[in-house]
Amino acid sequence: MTYKIIIAPTALKMLKGMSDRRVRDLIIKRIDDLTEEPEKQGKPLVAELSGYRSLRAAGQRYRIVYRVAHDKIMVYIIAVGIRKEGSSMDIYNLAKKLIRLRLFNPSE
């Protein structure tokens, strides 16, 4: 079954803001790979990000945070960026803020 990919406007902005084209292209390829069996890729997240998954891209530093909607056969990409543990700019902290501020709602 092929899933449709929906990239949230904020995630698209994060992706377009990457200055290294090679890294951006690698991330786009990983996003494209999510059309097939997205629930078998990445790892499930916990706590505030429960229900979302994280996939490594472009080496070990970058992450794609997404949610799989099996009923709609869609994958929602909510954030793309660098894992900076302990930083307010860490991709997981940014994803939590997006969800808390309701800047991304996969049910829309």
Placement of each model-derived feature along the sequence:
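Amphipathic alpha-helical interface surfaces
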Residues: 23, 27-30, 41, 87-95
